[in-house]
Amino acid sequence: MTPSIQISTLDAAREADLSIYDGVITIENSNIETPLRMDSSPPEQLVLRFDDICEPIDDFIEPQEIHIQRALTFADKIGDGSLLIHCHAGISRSSAIGLSIIAKKLGKGKELESVEILEKINPYSYPNKSLVLMTDDILERNMILYKMTSDKMSLTDTRIL
């Protein structure tokens, strides 16, 4: 069973009633000036700080496997609870992290179903290519998750967003 996942922009997350979620994954740019932080009350929040890039650029922070692993561990802790995953635009990084969580929950052999669920959650998904490749490796999907994702939707191969 997959967790209830919602993907949004940073602005939408700022305006949302976050208390309705069991967990919030905040993915922020390395140069964010006003980060979104939860107060001490539920839900729990995981903050990941990296930029929407696929190769090294100046002082920007590249996505790394540890970001995916931390998100997967956080989602495991939430279990079948509800998750809000947001990044600045709600398109690339949050979609890729959402896909990693869905694919892990569904298990091997369910890669196409994982991508289809992501499409239903966020029809505007353009997952970060680097994150999808790393997820495929972490979950030992032998490029199947990456291929299914790239066949069904566009992947961002951004220089910087």
Question: What is each stretch, according to the model?
Answer:
Residues 33-34, 56, 92-96:
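Short catalytic/ligand-binding loop motif for oxyanion handling, primarily in non-cytosolic enzymes
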Residues 46-84:
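Helix-loop module immediately N-terminal to the HCX5R catalytic loop
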Residues 67-71, 93, 97-98, 114, ...:
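Amphipathic alpha-helical interface surfaces
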Residues 78-80, 103-161:
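PTP/DSP superfamily signal
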